[in-house]
Amino acid sequence: MSAAITDRTRVIFLCTPNNPTGTVLHTDEVVEFLARVPQNVVVVMDEAYYHFNRDDAAVDGLTLLEDHPNVVVLRTFSKAYGLAGLRIGFAISTPEISDDLRRVATPFTVTTLAQQAAIASLAAEDELNERVNRIVAERTRVFDELTRQGWKIVPSQANFLWLATGDDTDRIDEVMVSHGVFARCWSEEGIRLSIGLDAENDRAIEALSQAVKG
């Protein structure tokens, strides 16, 4: 990616954990990358799925801010906090970049209700941890079950799994839909399967077992 930087480059986005694969960038590789990025290029780290990560080597964008003033960290209340319908999140950066963002931001984009819900969510850390830990445990269980079935799955640090199904994607999607399971599919590439409630995950496991047989 650093080789693609030119004089016209102004912003670089890094998504970790990545959507739709769930893979993460590690601290050492990000630090090495940042050393090759000019200081006038802003590096935005999208960490929407940060709370689901259990890889100790994964980068935490907040730890980079002191030494890299061109880094901006984005986080959201839509994923782990469960406030997707309220459309609220935040950016963490230097005061200079924050001032630039305020100058170009559309006013009144976040409602009072969304702000109150976000503040309340920050105070409910125990509930957040319980919910995230349950999802992570289910992610591991579903990963193990589907791997035993023979599916090629990328180890994920998000609240979903990526199945590399290639040319068979559309057929597998039809089987899943016939079992009442709806996933995000990319034809000829793969399927992103979100981790839900235990019973929902069981249904997905059963549907995919039938897709293997099909």
What annotation goes with each model-predicted range?
Residues 86, 157-159, 187-191:
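Short amphipathic alpha-helical segments
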Residues 28, 32, 174-214:
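PLP-dependent enzyme catalytic core of the Aspartate aminotransferase-like
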Residues 135-136, 140, 144-179, 195:
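Conserved PLP-binding catalytic core of the aspartate aminotransferase-like
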Residues 1-8, 20-43, 47-78:
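Active-site pre-lysine segment of PLP-dependent enzymes
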Residues 70-147, 151-154:
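PLP-dependent aminotransferase class I/II
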